Amino acid sequence: MPKPQSKRSSLPNYIKSRGELIASLQALLANDHVDLEILRSGVPWPSATEIVQLSQVSESNEDAPVAACHSSNEPVVVDPALGDDSHQAHIDLDVNWLSNLIPYNGDELSEQPDSSLFCSPPERMSVSDSSNNTDYLSHFSSSSICQWDNLLDSIGSQTFQDTINVLSPHCQDSGVSQPSNLADDTLGQGQPVSTVVQPQHPGSTERDESVSSIASSQESPRKRQRPHYAIEKRYRAGLQERFEALRDCVASLKKTQHEQRLPGTNEDLAEGDDGGSVSDRATVGRMNKAEVLNQATLCIRQLQEENEVVMEYIKLLIKQFRVMKQAMQQALKVDINS
């Protein structure tokens, strides 16, 4: 099986990336407010538009006024009516105030209960201007409390019975049958409760089977799935294409390094994993996959180290350029003023 060769040229992409780097560097030189820490090794350079946006944000932050801090010692405005005691309410309670709150109309107690049942005779429940006592529980005796509880129990039982008597005629008039009562009556009479089962027609089963068969026949046929070997073949072809591109890149890089070396150095005699020298392997021809991956790893590490050094030098040069730029601007201002 012939190996597919990569016919895509990387020259347009290289020119595009080079132009983007130049534009980013020019934007850094033009905008002095951008922090240089955005340049880090191993991280793609920010685009020119991103650098301009960062510069605008930093300038707006510098021009923004500082928010005034309010101290906690400022006087707090308080409504004088809240602290004024001249408008206090005067409450005078009647002796029979508790009995008046209970609208009782039963047959057992036709008359209103005497005030002596609830409150002791010598004590009066009143609030004067000079009295601030709010504890009203001391005005009740033990006998009055017991009678009060009995009264509440009788009222609650009678109210519940009246509610049942009022609702029962409505249920009888509307003709709504209560399921629980019907079930109790049926079980009490000894009659078994039976459930109604709908009869099935003899031809219903055959009719259902015929309908299901027609529906299954009308379904669209399944899409033909691609066999596994075709998917595997396509995957291997794409992987081989990318590996060939990596092989070409490593070979061209090795060739460039071999041409730049000086003759008679120890680098030409360096041995690889298989015992052969690098120069001999470069002149022989194609490399196997292990050699390609090994050389690619070495190239990546070397590029990372060089990138770190170059990034530090770029930051230093940009800082020096900004200092010189500020000095020139100050000198121009002095000349103009003079």
From Swiss-Prot:
What subcellular compartments does it reside in? Answer: Nucleus
Q: What is its main location?
A: nucleus
The UniProt GO MF terms for this protein read: DNA binding; protein dimerization activity
- Cross-referenced PROSITE patterns, in alphabetical order? BHLH
Null phenotype? Abolishes the production of gramillins A and B.
Segments of skewed composition (Polar residues): 174-203
* Record region (Basic motif): 223-236
Q: Which residues form the bHLH domain?
A: 223-303
Q: Mention any one GO cellular component term assigned to this protein in its UniProt record.
A: nucleus
Provide the residue span(s) of the region labelled Helix-loop-helix motif: 237-303
Question: Entry's Gene3D superfamilies?
Answer: Helix-loop-helix DNA-binding domain (4.10.280.10)
The segments labelled Disordered in the record are 171-230, 256-277
Q: Which residue ranges run through the membrane?
A: none
**Which domain of life does the UniProt lineage start with?**
Eukaryota
In terms of InterPro entries, this protein maps to: bHLH_dom, HLH_DNA-bd_sf, Regulatory_TF_Diverse
* Annotated Pfam families: HLH
Q: Which UniProt keywords apply?
A: DNA-binding, Nucleus, Transcription, Transcription regulation
Summarizing the function annotation, the protein's role is: Transcription factor that specifically regulates the expression of the gene cluster that mediates the biosynthesis of gramillins A and B, bicyclic lipopeptides that induce cell death in maize leaves but not in wheat leaves.
Q: What is this protein called?
A: Transcription factor GRA2
Please tell me the species this chain comes from. Answer: Gibberella zeae (strain ATCC MYA-4620 / CBS 123657 / FGSC 9075 / NRRL 31084 / PH-1) (Wheat head blight fungus)
